[in-house]
Structures are given as C-alpha cells and as structure tokens.
C-alpha cells in the first residue's frame, strides 16, 4: 500500500481495488467511497470488464504481513493470459496453487520471500515468464533479481524490468 502511488493515479475516473482492511486509510485520505472496491482473499471478481482473482498474501515466518489482515496478491486475466502479482508475501499454500502465464514475485527478503524462496515458488508453479519485484528501494538488491533469474528452470523465462 502506497499513498504516494495512489496520489499519482487518482482522478475522477479511477477505481481503487483494495483489501477491506485498508478501506479506512483511503476514506481518511478523502477518497470517495464510490471509487473504492474492497476484496477478500481467494475470490474471483469482475470490475469494469476486467476479470481477476485474489490470492492470500502474508508472511509465514515473520510478523510484517499477518494472514489475519486479509491482504492479497492478484491474478489479472487479460486476453486469456493470467498475470500473477504476488504482493508482499512468503511462499504459502495458496500461492503454490497459482496457475499463471506471467508471475511478478518479490525477491527482496526481510518483508517478503527472498530470491531463493521466490525461485522455488516459481519453479513449482511454472509460469512461462517470471519477473522479480520488491527489491532495490527498501530492501533487496539488483543482485537478488539476477540470482533469482539464475535459479529458474530453463523453460521459465526470467525478465528483469528494473535496470540502472
């Protein structure tokens, strides 16, 4: 959740999709409740002709992102292609069941899975493309992204989007 990023995209036509637990923060910020749709983990949704699923996103061995908060990652389906954006999470029973074509997974460690854990998850769920995220600003380094790509099975294409 980033108020800075919300400020960059909010306008009179913006719809914000968030877990229920974050609703109060957005309302306090002055965002119109009609512009907000709340979601729960592990459900299917259709908003403005965009189909998506939510997947629980939480830590299993640290306290930063507790499961009880109901935070989520998203699988967005566009033209039949399934894009998984994991969110801030560790490997969980829920995300080990994800079926996707493209996966965006955190590799920074500390608040999320590290690059080794992320590669393990990706090698298990087997998307066609895997893209490391959540590194290079708060925690994690570009080397984590490089090491993540190195650990992927050969049939999975790893792509680094953040470059210096």
Residue ranges and their predicted role:
Residues 10-16, 81-83:
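Short active-site oxyanion
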Residues 15, 30-46, 119, 123, ...:
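Binuclear metal-ion centers of metallo-dependent hydrolases, dominated by the metallo-beta-lactamase
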Residues 37-99, 113, 162-164:
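Core dinuclear metal-dependent hydrolase active-site scaffold
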Residues 1-12, 20-25:
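Di-metal (Zn2+ and/or Mg2+/Mn2+) metal-binding site signature of metallo-dependent hydrolases
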Residues 1, 23-26, 43-46, 61-62, ...:
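Active-site environment of divalent metal-dependent phosphoester hydrolases
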């Amino acid at each position: 959740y980033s108020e800075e990023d919300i400020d960059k995209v909010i306008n009179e036509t913006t719809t914000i999709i968030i877990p229920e637990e974050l609703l109060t923060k957005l309302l306090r910020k002055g965002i119109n409740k009609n512009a907000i749709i709340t979601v729960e983990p592990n459900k299917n949704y259709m908003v403005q002709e965009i189909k998506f699923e939510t997947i629980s996103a939480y830590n299993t061995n640290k306290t930063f992102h507790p499961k009880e908060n109901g935070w989520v990652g998203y699988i967005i389906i566009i033209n039949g292609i399934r894009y998984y954006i994991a969110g801030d999470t560790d490997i969980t029973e829920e995300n080990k069941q994800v079926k996707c074509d493209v996966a965006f997974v955190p590799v920074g460690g500390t608040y999320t899975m590290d690059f080794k854990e992320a590669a393990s998850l990706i090698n298990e769920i087997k998307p066609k493309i895997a893209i490391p995220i959540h590194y290079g600003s708060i925690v994690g380094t570009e080397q984590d992204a490089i090491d993540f790509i190195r650990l992927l099975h050969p049939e999975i294409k790893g792509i680094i989007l953040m470059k210096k």
